[in-house]
UniProtKB/Swiss-Prot annotation:
This is Methionyl-tRNA formyltransferase. NCBIfam families: fmt (TIGR00460). It is an enzyme of class 2 (transferase). InterPro entries: Fmt (IPR005794), Formyl_trans_C (IPR005793), Formyl_trans_C_sf (IPR037022), Formyl_transf_N (IPR002376), Formyl_transf_N_sf (IPR036477), Formyl_transferase-like_C_sf (IPR011034), GART_AS (IPR001555), Met-tRNA-FMT_C (IPR044135). It catalyses: L-methionyl-tRNA(fMet) + (6R)-10-formyltetrahydrofolate = N-formyl-L-methionyl-tRNA(fMet) + (6S)-5,6,7,8-tetrahydrofolate + H(+). PROSITE patterns: GART.
């Protein structure tokens, strides 16, 4: 029989899993997500992608500010769920909540644990130059992404992949994997294995100070830095346009042959020298503007050597 589940998630990454579990016939007793926040130019309240999807599916939505009160625990238990599924919820679950459902809480994590425990596994995998990533279903405990692993799906990372590309590849894979895990849980065949502590790394939240491009680094490192921060927060540089510094985010680039002083513009196609080698910018975003192809940017803002970016 299908399970009665509590779903807990917030961003786009979690939506495919919610939809897949619903499509597979599981009874979603409640959807927990973060409260609406002001966003955009008008600072209007914006509900989360998970809340939007839940309402489209006709599912009840809860947005508690904390799970650490007796009232929150009582409400959680009152759903009489078999298990909870957690995907990028954005709030730490205390032990009493983890123990409030008889079959446990299961998390979908976007890394090959124990590598990249923490908040930004997709970005860190690309920024560090990992050859592969993946998604894992684990049974949650009180540690930070330390629970026993139930299922894994691996994916190769290419130089052309941005964080958005990897996110978009892993989200549907994760949805299918969690659905498989819930079938196994229902049938009593879910096999849990401890992670172990060998190879543990932590994916710290991305800080704004990390976003500035360091052109003195080798081209391959610059490419990984750019792609790992694309689209958010976006790796950036500044260039003087009409005598004033203008910040430009780089959303996609490629490795090319070339050499020069780090930050030097090498041609009229936005090829920029790095500490070793060079990169060519493919997609950029000027401050306050929409993302665009680099060649379209150049039509409105020609940049011609000799010129250096900062």
């Amino acid at each position: 029989m299908p399970l009665r589940l509590i779903f807990m998630g917030t961003p786009d990454f979690a939506v495919p899993t919610l939809r897949e579990l619903h499509a597979q016939g599981h009874e979603i007793a409640a959807v927990y997500t973060r409260a609406a926040k002001p966003a955009g130019r008008g600072m209007k309240l914006q509900i989360t992608p998970v809340e939007k999807a839940a309402r489209e599916l006709g599912l009840p939505v809860l947005t508690p500010s904390t799970l650490r009160t007796p009232e929150a625990e009582a409400e959680f238990r009152a759903h009489n769920a078999d298990a909870a599924v957690v995907v990028a919820y954005g709030m730490i679950l205390p032990a009493n909540i983890l123990n409030a459902v008889p079959r446990g809480c299961f998390n979908l994590h976007a890394s090959l644990l124990p590598r990249w425990r923490g908040a930004a596994p997709i970005q860190r995998a690309i920024m560090t130059g990992d050859a592969e990533s993946g998604v894992m279903v684990m049974k949650m405990d009180v540690g930070l992404d330390t629970g026993d692993v139930a299922m894994t799906d691996r994916l190769q990372i290419t130089d052309a992949m941005t964080a958005q590309d990897l996110h978009d590849a892993l989200a549907p894979r994760g949805a299918r994997l969690m659905a498989q895990a819930m079938v196994a849980l229902e049938q009593g065949s879910l096999n849990l294995k401890p992670q172990g502590e060998e190879g543990v790394t932590y994916a710290a939240k991305i800080g704004k100070a990390e976003a500035k491009i360091d052109w003195a680094r080798p081209a391959h490192d610059v490419l990984r830095h750019i792609h790992g921060l694309s689209p958010f927060p976006g790796a950036w540089f500044e260039v003087a346009i009409d005598g004033a510094p203008v910040r430009i985010k780089v959303l996609r680039c490629e490795l090319v042959k070339g050499s020069g002083a780090p930050g030097a513009l090498l041609d009229d196609r936005l090829t920029i020298a790095c500490g070793e080698g060079a990169i060519r910018l493919l997609d950029v975003q000027r401050a306050g503007k929409q993302p665009m192809r680099a060649l379209d940017f150049l039509r409105g803002t020609p940049l011609i050597p000799p010129l250096s970016v900062m």
